[in-house]
């Protein structure tokens, strides 16, 4: 088995190496991503699939995987999780990407469209997840910490998560832990449930079920700079995580959003219209005139870091009906996200919001 603690040139994965890789020109990054996918496909004898969301990152990953499949003579399997949380334009782009790849490459391509189901095979909706578990808020780590701390309080017990939230968590040497999140302790008093279960139920469980049924391993387009969890995973496994419980290839881990946009521009990859146009700023960097990132429309993770107009303010302009459903109270048939945003003091549709370059 490959030793994925090291890069192709024998260097260990650390912060310095990641910075070096991120500074490489796009052509070099494409070659490295191809090399990692060749390594992955060969190791698993072609029994792999690409997670395709219809967004810009996964579309690029699918195109590079198609190149590798054509080189090695393998079938390209694309898997789309139809969670009901995608922008309509992104959902439609899944078929556009499939048709684009069919025309461009001389390989067999299979597109599988799946959705989250309960044990009886009934579709699970986002509203059901919110009602049963709570809202995904701030980050997966913070949501998980809040949920665990609340359980500890209900039992009258101390716990790792409660100490983490109160800021009293210590390292082995007695020093304060860097993993505390006391900043968000006020969320313990929020008048709504908070949970990190959403992604697991809506995406990960269907993916694992598909992997088990088809005996395939996954390829995804996540990047190390997107979160601390993804960064630490790259430090541990590199791009190809052979030794994870669920093996996964992340061939674009060292890429940046600028790389993705440049690749799409150069290769004329189909792009969902919600992104708008790909443009260059004064420094030569790429950006989109529409939304910057798509993902799940109603997700609250990272909202605290967004400049105005944030994702919900943009949604009000671009998708007013979906915005109304999102913000409206639960007892009036909505998702109740408005009151959640009010609680953490995040604007979501005020008339005086600032209009910036990425506004549609």
Name what the model sees in each region.
Residues 2-19, 46, 244-245, 256-360:
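ATP/NTP-dependent adenylation/nucleotidyl-transfer catalytic domains that generate, transfer
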């Amino acid at each position: 088995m490959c030793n994925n603690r090291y890069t192709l040139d024998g260097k260990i994965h650390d912060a310095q190496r990641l910075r070096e890789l991120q500074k490489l020109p796009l052509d070099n990054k494409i070659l490295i991503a191809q090399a990692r996918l060749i390594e992955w496909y060969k190791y698993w004898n072609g029994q792999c699939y690409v997670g395709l969301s219809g967004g810009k990152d996964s579309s690029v990953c699918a195109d590079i995987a198609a190149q590798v499949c054509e080189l090695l003579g393998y079938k390209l399997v694309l898997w789309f999780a139809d969670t009901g949380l995608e922008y309509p334009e992104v959902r439609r782009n899944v078929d556009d990407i499939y048709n684009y790849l069919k025309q461009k490459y001389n390989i067999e391509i299979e597109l599988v469209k799946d959705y989250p189901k309960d044990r009886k095979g009934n579709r699970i909706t986002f509203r059901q997840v919110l009602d049963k578990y709570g809202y995904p808020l701030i980050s997966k780590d913070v949501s998980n910490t809040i949920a665990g701390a609340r359980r500890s309080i209900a039992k009258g017990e101390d716990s790792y998560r409660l100490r983490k939230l109160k800021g009293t968590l210590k390292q082995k040497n007695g020093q304060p832990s860097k993993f505390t999140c006391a900043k968000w302790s006020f969320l313990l008093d929020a008048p709504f449930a908070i949970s990190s279960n959403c992604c697991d139920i809506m995406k990960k469980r269907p993916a694992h079920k598909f992997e088990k049924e088809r005996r395939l391993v996954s390829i995804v387009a996540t990047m190390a700079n997107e979160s601390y969890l993804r960064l630490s995973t790259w430090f541990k496994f590199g791009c190809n995580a052979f030794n994870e419980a669920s093996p996964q290839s992340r061939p674009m881990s060292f890429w940046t959003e600028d790389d993705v946009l440049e690749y799409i521009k150069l290769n004329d990859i189909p792009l969902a219209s919600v992104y708008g146009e790909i443009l260059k700023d004064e420094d030569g960097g790429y950006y989109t005139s529409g939304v910057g990132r798509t993902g799940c429309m109603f997700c609250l993770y990272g909202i605290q870091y967004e400049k105005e107009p944030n994702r919900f303010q943009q949604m009000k302009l671009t998708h007013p009906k979906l915005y109304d459903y999102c913000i409206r109270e639960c007892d009036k048939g909505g998702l109740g996200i408005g009151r959640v945003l009010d609680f953490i003091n995040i604007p979501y549709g005020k008339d005086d919001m600032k209009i910036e370059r990425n506004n549609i």
